[in-house]
A protein has these predicted regions:
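Short, ordered, surface-exposed loop/turn motifs in non-cytosolic proteins
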Residues: 30, 37-52, 60, 71, ...
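A short, amphipathic beta-strand motif
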Residues: 30-36, 231, 637-639
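A short, solvent-exposed loop/turn motif at the edges and junctions
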Residues: 50, 146-150, 166-204
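C-terminal tail/sorting-segment detector
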Residues: 74-88, 92-98, 102, 119, ...
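Middle-to-C-terminal accessory/interaction subdomains
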Residues: 237, 260, 278, 288, ...
């Protein structure tokens, strides 16, 4: 009998569950299409990856991608049973009948982003389970059985006219066995213009469409454009900003973006514990040092109006690029980190005017803060964000000092996860280090971060451990701490001007040991002037990562050298930026002296271009000739500088 109203038409599907476990290595291929959620247009250039592994694809001009990889799954050879589940759709509701599947104990329905839609324990004698109404889309249904066995299949309540339909396919069984837990990496979708997206464990769905939500901040970081930033500051406030530069106090300024008036914001000079003291004395008198002629700015859009935002941002940095005579180090470095899948600030060149007077070329750099977290972890934006707090002790105050999450009072912040991270590292042995630490850190991601950091010869980042009478510590990085269950702690790079040297200033020129070389002693070594640094390998997290995961690191580096760090790719990027900023640099009022003018800039750009093939070649030689030492030695837990 045919139903009169198709809306109530029942669609039935029987799924046979064969719990069959076997050892196999097979190839999996995902194909899909990525589109803009608002316009529906295809999105080109989306980075699609299997977690943070080397399996990466990029969408074409039609938004299509194909990602293939070999999947090695260890399984115990055993046939458990064969059962059947009746799956029925009435309207938008799914009804499951487990009458012929007595081993089923619990069901869970999940969206492709990993969120739980529905979960229920199957009560003996009550085999019928009615799930809530489902909207259009693909869902993963997981059924738990005895002996840690689990079946998965996908359901898709596609609406055809008014008639819901279901498409389901079985996946292989998974079981926790000796030697590890069988798991799948999520598919990650990243593009500078959009919020990131992930699909958790799409076991039985190999072809699908994805919609990415545009990120409003991306407009500011369009690398094809050079926008104008004009600040009107009173004479008194200008003098105050100079006088109080070391106090880092904001002063009011009227901000105009291109031809649009934004309103009153806060502005101040920006600099680390080195650059501002270099340029100002305690009275606010500026130094005559050439690097102090043009100083970076920090902008605070909500300083005088708590609700004011600038393209969803509260803060923004304008880097003067004074110490980088090529003007390319920051933008090349941040771009390379992002191309390698690392969560990194976006950046774009801009023109700056103070009271309508041209100040030259600057680089707008995204601020790692709560708004940054919201743009990178849209489903988990409220975690702690720490600046320069390495897991080296169990002091709550130590981690609270580094909190950069603006909305959360530091005194009430829960920093227990970072303390647990430190304890896992401190207590780990060579045999259980990866297992213990991977509960807090994604090692594929960490190795990719190190690969970029070492390739660009970053001599002022997390791999350089400065030493003083207060202890030792690294800097120019952030950690973001996810709040979700089993959430990880992620590194974010910062301050990239001391990069892209032809040789590593600390390792190649001053003789400090590389990160993977175990030193005979962890005594500090002299680097430049009176500055000292601890051998990087002496940090237990870094040292044991080098000792235990070197082969994985080499594979990541080999892929990077052939793609994003290849000579053609980097040279193309450099030439694009050179052409983009040429006329701006030519007019920069601070590039006028004989040793720091337009012609010297051209010379520095050419030097950087000539350095790229040398850096590529030497890095290739390094990873294939410098395997870590096998000599046994004690690791030193470094004591971080706290003030």
């Amino acid at each position: 009998m045919t139903a009169k109203f198709s809306f109530f038409k029942k669609v039935m599907y029987a799924v046979t569950i064969c719990l069959c476990i076997s050892t196999s290595i097979f190839s999996t291929t995902y194909t899909g299409n990525v589109r803009d959620s608002k316009s529906g247009n295809p999105v080109k250039g989306v980075r699609v990856s299997l977690g943070y592994t080397n399996y990466v694809a990029t969408t074409d001009e039609n938004g299509n991608f194909t990602l293939s990889f070999e999947d090695s799954i260890r399984k115990e050879q055993k046939t458990f049973l064969s059962e059947k589940v009746d799956l029925q759709f009435t309207g938008g509701n799914a009804v499951l009948n487990f009458n012929a599947a007595p081993s089923a104990k619990k069901i869970g329905l999940f969206a492709l982003n990993g969120k739980t839609v529905y979960s229920q324990t199957i009560v003996p004698g009550e085999p019928v389970v009615k799930m809530p109404s489902l909207s259009k889309g693909i869902y993963i249904l997981k059924i738990d059985h005895p002996q840690n066995l689990q079946t998965e299949f996908s359901i898709n309540p596609v609406v055809n006219g008014n008639s819901p339909m279901v498409v389901a396919s079985m996946s292989s069984m998974q079981q926790q066995i000796a030697g590890g837990v069988l798991s799948k990496e999520p598919l990650l979708f990243k593009h500078d213009t959009y919020y990131p997206h992930s699909i958790a464990m799409p076991v039985s769905v190999h072809s699908f469409a994805i919609s990415l939500n545009p990120d409003p901040r991306a407009y500011i970081f369009n690398e094809q454009k050079i926008y104008s930033y004009n600040f009107t500051i009173s004479k008194d406030d200008s003098l105050k900003m100079e006088r109080d530069a070391l106090l880092e106090n904001f002063v009011p300024a009227q901000f105009k973006f291109n031809d649009s008036s934004i309103g009153q914001i806060g502005i101040r000079y920006k600099g680390s514990g080195y650059s501002l003291p270099l340029c100002f004395d305690s009275r606010g008198v500026r130094s005559s040092d050439w690097r102090c002629k043009k100083i970076s700015f920090k902008l605070k859009f909500d300083k005088y109006s708590g609700s004011q935002r600038f393209f969803s941002m509260k803060r923004l940095n304008l880097h003067s690029l004074s110490g980088d005579q090529s003007k390319m180090h920051d933008i090349l470095s941040y771009g390379l980190f992002r191309e390698m899948g690392i969560i990194s600030p976006r950046a774009a060149f801009v023109k700056v005017f103070i009271n309508s007077v041209f100040q030259g070329l600057f680089l707008a750099v995204e601020e790692p803060d709560s708004r940054f977290a919201e743009s990178r972890w849209p489903d988990d934006p409220y975690g702690n964000l720490y600046k320069e707090k390495w897991p080296v002790n169990d002091s709550k105050e130590y981690y609270k000092e580094g909190l950069a999450t603006n909305e959360k009072p530091k005194d009430n912040a829960d920093v227990s996860k970072m303390i647990s991270f430190y304890k896992a590292i401190n207590r780990a042995t060579e045999s259980d280090f990866v297992e213990k630490v991977s509960k807090f850190m994604n090692f594929d991601y960490f190795l990719r971060y190190i690969a970029v950091d070492r390739a660009i010869h970053n001599c002022d980042g997390m791999m350089t451990w400065y030493y003083s009478n207060k202890g030792s510590g690294n800097h120019n990085y952030f950690f973001y701490e996810e709040t979700i269950a089993n959430g990880k702690i992620w590194q974010i790079p910062w301050d990239m001007d001391n990069t892209f040297y032809r040789q590593d200033p600390i390792v190649d020129e001053l003789g400090a040991p590389e990160w993977n070389v175990r030193p005979r002693t962890c005594e500090p070594v002299k680097i430049w002037g009176d500055n000292l640094a601890m051998p990087t390998h002496c940090d237990k997290l870094i040292g044991m990562t080098a000792d235990l995961l070197w082969d994985e690191y080499v594979k990541i580096c080999e892929q990077m050298l052939a793609t994003h760090f290849s000579v053609p790719h980097l040279t193309s990027r450099l030439d694009f930026y050179k052409d983009l900023i040429d006329t701006i640099v030519r007019k920069d009022p601070y590039l006028k002296d004989p040793y720091n003018d337009y012609n010297s800039w051209l010379g520095n750009v050419n030097y950087l271009r000539e350095s790229i093939p040398i850096m590529n070649s030497t890095y290739d030689s390094y990873i294939h000739k410098k395997a870590p030492s096998n000599k046994k030695n004690q690791f030193c837990l470094l004591i971080a500088i706290t003030s």
